[in-house]
Amino acid sequence: MAEGPSLHPKLQVASNIPIEISSQIPQELAKNLPFQMSQSPLVTPGSTMQSSLSVPERNLLQQESEGPSRQSGCMPLSDKYVNKQTGLLASRNFRKERIVYSKEQQRLLQKHFDECQYPKEKKIVELAVLIGVTKMEIKKWFKNNRAKYRQMNLQNIKQALPESNGSSKAVSESTHFPGSIPVVASDNGESICSGTFGEDSIPKFNCSQESSLYCFQA
C-alpha cells in the first residue's frame, strides 16, 4: 500500500504531545483526588442548592426559617395584666370627671360650711340627698373648701405681718432714749452740761444744775 505523505518531524512531535498530556492528566487527578476530598468540605445537596441561589433569595429563606421561632418566643399577655391596665385607664377617666355645682347648691353647701366645717356623717348623707350626689363628693367639697380657707388665712396673716412690723418699729423709735441729754443753753448764755443715764443708775447732774434747782426752790 502506498503510504501517505510524510509529515515534518517537528509537526509529528507536536501532534504527539497532546496525546501524552491527555494520558497523564487522568493519572494525576486520580492520585490527588483523595487529598482534595479530605481538604474540601462535604458537599451536600442542600449546600449546592444554597450556593446556586442568589444573595437576596438566601436572606429571604433565612428570614422565613427564623420567623416562626421568633413568633413562638413572644408570650401572650395574661388576663390579669390586661384587666389591670383596663382598670387603671378606667380609674383615670373617672378621676377626670368633675362635678359642677349650681349656684343654689353652692349656697347651700357654703351655708352648712359656715355653720360647721367638719359635718357629721348624718349631715353629709342629708346634703348628698338634697344635692343629688354621693357622700364622697360632699366630703371632697368640704375638704377642698377647708384647704381654700386655710390658704386664705395664711395669706391674710402674711399681709398683716409687714404692717405690724412697721408699727412696732415706729413705737420703738418713739420710745428710744439716747444715752445722754443734749446740751441746753441757759438764759445768761452759759452752757449747762448734760446729765447721763447709766445702766441701773440714777441721773447725775452737775453743780450748775444743782444750784439752779436750789434757786428755783428758794
Curated annotation (Swiss-Prot):
Question: Which residues form the DNA-binding region?
Answer: 94-153
Question: Null phenotype?
Answer: No visible phenotype; mice are viable and fertile. Female mice lacking maternally transcribed Obox1, Obox2, Obox5, Obox7 as well as zygotically expressed Obox3 and Obox4 are infertile: embryos arrest at two-four cell stage due to impaired zygotic genome activation (ZGA).
User: What SMART domains has UniProt attached to this entry?
Assistant: HOX
Q: Which UniProt keywords apply?
A: Developmental protein, DNA-binding, Homeobox, Nucleus, Transcription, Transcription regulation
Identify the GO cellular component terms for this protein: nucleus
Q: What does this protein do?
A: Transcription factor required for zygotic genome activation (ZGA), a critical event in early embryonic development during which the developmental control passes from maternally provided mRNAs to the expression of the zygotic genome after fertilization. Together with other Obox family members, required in early two-cell stage embryos to kick-start the major ZGA wave by facilitating RNA Polymerase II 'pre-configuration', during which RNA Polymerase II relocates from the initial one-cell stage binding targets to ZGA gene promoters and distal enhancers.
Residues annotated as transmembrane: none
Q: What is this protein called?
A: Oocyte-specific homeobox protein 7
Specify the species.
Mus musculus (Mouse)
